[in-house]
Amino acid sequence: MTIKEAITNADSLQNNNFNQPMKIKWLSELEEKIMNEQFATHETLNEYEMRDWILYIRNMFLPLYTDDEETKENLEWDFDENTELLAPLEYQGMYTTYLLSKYALHSGEYERYSIFENKFSTEYQNFCNYINRTYKPLQKNKIEVS
């Protein structure tokens, strides 16, 4: 699923006045969450390459764990409508639900937001469970013998 497809799905379910760059920003925030919480903490497929504190994936550089504000500000985000989203097909519904929750939150529809946010949380947890079942956690522990 591409960013454009996720946005089209969400827009077909709920009319809204949010512009395309805002929707892309929301989806990029979710992708960053997925990478920081899942891909950075698990062994990944060959197409994912770790480089110090930056993850290079599908022609994008994305930050992992960093507290350096200057570094965060200087990173260029290269998300456009044709960017493929990370989740496998069976978990891609969470992108639509995530956008619907953002639409409701920023429109002041807090009851709808609560419903969509709960649904998104369940879908995201199912995706996390899939990652945990499929990939081994990164092992950074060491035993030193004196």
Model-derived features: where do they sit?
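Conserved short "hinge" loops at termini or chain/domain junctions
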Residues: 1-84, 122-146
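Generic detector of ordered secondary-structure context
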Residues: 22, 91-92, 112
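Generic structural signal for hydrophobic core residues of well-folded globular domains
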Residues: 34, 38, 102-107
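Structural motif
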Residues: 83-93
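Short, positively charged, low-complexity/disordered linker segments
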Residues: 87-89, 104, 108-109
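Short, hydrophobic/amphipathic alpha-helical patches that form generic packing surfaces
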Residues: 93-105
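Short conserved catalytic/interaction loops centered on acidic-Pro-aromatic/His motifs
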Residues: 108-117
